[in-house]
């Protein structure tokens, strides 16, 4: 690779690292923050506020990128994240901390969308597969580095420095972005009219979905929220079909793209089961340290990267449908094997290689399909909504898997069995979905 390409990759890694490490590094300091700021039972708002802001920011990035150069949007996202981090570090009360986390979340939403769009503009296949594998694996690697870095900082400094550490990283990222984020093929359509009605309906839809996910008081309200969300979605679809430059380009959702979005949503739910609750199980039930549990999970990231470095060779021999079905089968098999070897960390680590191969293909290929099979003018918007789909899947996954993990031993056995059973059911559902709905096209048969 040329020097500029290498610098672009480093910038993407730093951008993803800042977003990915937030949860794992902050979670260690929750007891201290709770005591210092007298947060009480509201302490979970640290994550909730961040996630809500991230979800709000995700889809608007596509609209911004259709009007402004990516370099300006990237710098704005990094500045928002840096300002939010700095304010978090300065926080002297819980209200200020939550406001700061919202600002930080807005910045993170911008950065996460860019990590899906920049590879398309900067790299051609098969190099793009490798780059996306490296960038995507940052999530897994951060699960190890986060506790280690966070523990080291808390050993010698206060929790405020967990936020300050982002600032020098962001400054380096801004310098690299200014240097490398110049793409000749980048297109903007700044003269188009802003789709206010579409944006309003979309955020009403997202608000209803998020309320249904986060509300834990009256389940009836959750049900009503989902019903209203469906009604709003139908109105949104009808409105956006007749807009020249829609906020949500519904005409892009053909059979293939729709299938990819559904696949990514369900896969994100499964990934949360592995990434969040296998480490929790290893620590709570088997007595491993955070670092040891992170090392058990690490093979998933290694397999993820390895698969992407060889993906173009695999696609030369097998069709898209076959590889997807193999990926879902690997996910199913890995969940079953871990269920039988649930008390053996070494076996779990080995089997997570299979899961890593599965996640590596699904996430990377889903992203590339959206990049390549949507119209050039709508690609940035579609990638922003694709990122939103992953984040919603992660939120739904953390909620559902958390509920299943909280169920004590019963017909499913130890509580991790409940999570693994859910992954197995989703894997079977994905297999059925692709067998029934995917139709191979001649251009896709040997990618």
From Swiss-Prot:
Gene behind the chain: sdrM
Gene3D superfamilies the record matches: MFS general substrate transporter like domains, Multidrug resistance protein D
Subcellular compartments: Cell membrane
Alphabetized PROSITE patterns for the sequence: MFS
Protein name: Multidrug efflux pump SdrM
Source organism, top-level taxon: Bacteria
Record InterPro entries: MFS, MFS_dom, MFS_Drug_Efflux_Pump, MFS_trans_sf
Similarity section: Belongs to the major facilitator superfamily.
């Amino acid at each position: 690779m040329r020097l500029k390409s290498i610098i672009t990759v480093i910038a993407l890694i730093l951008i993803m690292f800042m977003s990915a490490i937030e949860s794992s590094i902050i979670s260690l300091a929750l007891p201290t923050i709770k005591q210092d700021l007298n947060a009480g039972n509201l302490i979970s708002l640290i994550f909730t506020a961040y996630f809500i802001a991230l979800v709000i920011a995700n889809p608007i990035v596509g609209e911004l990128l259709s009007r402004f150069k990516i370099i300006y949007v990237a710098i704005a996202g990094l500045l928002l994240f840096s300002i939010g981090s700095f304010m978090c570090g300065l926080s002297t009360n819980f209200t200020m901390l939550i406001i700061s986390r919202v600002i930080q979340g807005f910045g993170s939403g911008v950065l996460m969308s860019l990590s899906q769009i920049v590879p398309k503009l900067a790299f051609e296949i098969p190099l793009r597969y490798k780059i996306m594998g490296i960038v995507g694996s940052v999530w897994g690697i951060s699960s190890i580095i986060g506790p280690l870095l966070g523990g080291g900082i808390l050993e010698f400094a206060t929790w405020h420095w967990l936020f300050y550490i982002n600032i020098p990283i962001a400054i380096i990222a801004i310098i690299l972005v200014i240097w490398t984020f110049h793409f000749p093929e980048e297109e903007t359509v700044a003269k188009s009219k802003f789709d206010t009605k579409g944006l309003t309906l979309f955020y009403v839809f997202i608000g209803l979905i998020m309320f249904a996910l986060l509300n834990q008081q009256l389940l009836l309200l959750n049900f009503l929220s989902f019903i209203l969300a469906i009604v709003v979605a139908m109105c949104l679809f009808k409105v956006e079909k007749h807009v020249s430059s829609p906020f949500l380009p519904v005409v892009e959702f053909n059979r293939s793209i729709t299938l990819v979005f559904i696949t990514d949503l369900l896969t994100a739910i499964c990934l949360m089961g592995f990434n969040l609750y296998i480490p929790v199980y290893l620590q709570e039930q088997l007595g491993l340290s955070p670092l040891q549990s992170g090392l058990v999970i690490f093979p998933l990231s290694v397999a993820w990267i390895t698969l992407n470095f060889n993906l173009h060779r695999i696609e030369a021999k097998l069709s898209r449908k076959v590889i997807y079905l193999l990926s879902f089968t690997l996910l199913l098999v890995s969940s079953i094997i871990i269920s039988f070897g649930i008390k053996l960390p070494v076996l779990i680590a080995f089997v997570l290689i299979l899961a890593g191969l599965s996640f590596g293909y699904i996430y990377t290929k889903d992203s590339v399909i959206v990049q390549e099979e949507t119209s050039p003018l709508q690609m940035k918007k579609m990638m922003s909504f694709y990122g939103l789909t992953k984040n919603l899947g992660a939120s739904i996954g953390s909620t559902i898997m958390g509920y299943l993990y909280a169920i004590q031993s019963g017909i499913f056995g130890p509580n991790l069995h409940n999570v693994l059973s859910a992954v197995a059911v989703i894997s079977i559902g994905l297999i059925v979905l692709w067998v029934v709905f995917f139709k191979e096209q001649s251009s896709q048969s040997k990618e």
